[in-house]
Amino acid sequence: MFRFILTTMLLAAILGCGGDNADKYTQEGFVYFQQQKYDEAIASYEKAIKAEPRAAAAYNMIGMAYRFKFNQQGAPEFRQKEMAAFQKAVEIDPKNWVAMINLATDHYADGEKGKAAALFKKALELNPNHPEKAEIEKMIAAGEPKP
């Protein structure tokens, strides 16, 4: 499942970035990401954003790199940067369901289940056949107010 998600994110990153340089840097960043060289990946994604400031997929991948750094080191600033990157990706491309799910997952993990539920719902509207739909629906239910 993890490979499917990463492959989906790479495809979204390549399609979501404009210009040859942005594509090149996004692909370079993904190679670093796969090698678990997260600082190098972030630097490459930042170059992609410099080449194409509306590269929502590059912001999403920066968020993923910070997520892995946070998971390894637990530094709160990595979580903040992770969430900010996902938020920026969603702001740039409100149909970017991948970034939306990533941001929702962070809110859910941080106990903000109401915020998470709203994002998860929107993501499922955009991608109703998501392979993890059943699990996402459980998280939506956990975040909705009880009657």
Which residue ranges define each predicted feature?
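C-terminal motif of bacterial Sec signal peptides marking the signal peptidase cleavage site
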Residues: 13-16
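Bacterial Sec signal peptide processing site at the extreme N-terminus
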Residues: 18-32
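Helix-start (N-cap) detector for alpha-helical repeat units in TPR-like alpha-solenoids
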Residues: 21-23, 56-57, 97-98, 131
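Canonical tetratricopeptide repeat
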Residues: 27, 61, 102, 135-139
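Structural signature of tandem alpha-helical TPR/SEL1-like repeats
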Residues: 34-47, 71-88, 110-122
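Terminal, low-structured helical/coil segments at or just beyond the last alpha-helical repeat
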Residues: 114-147
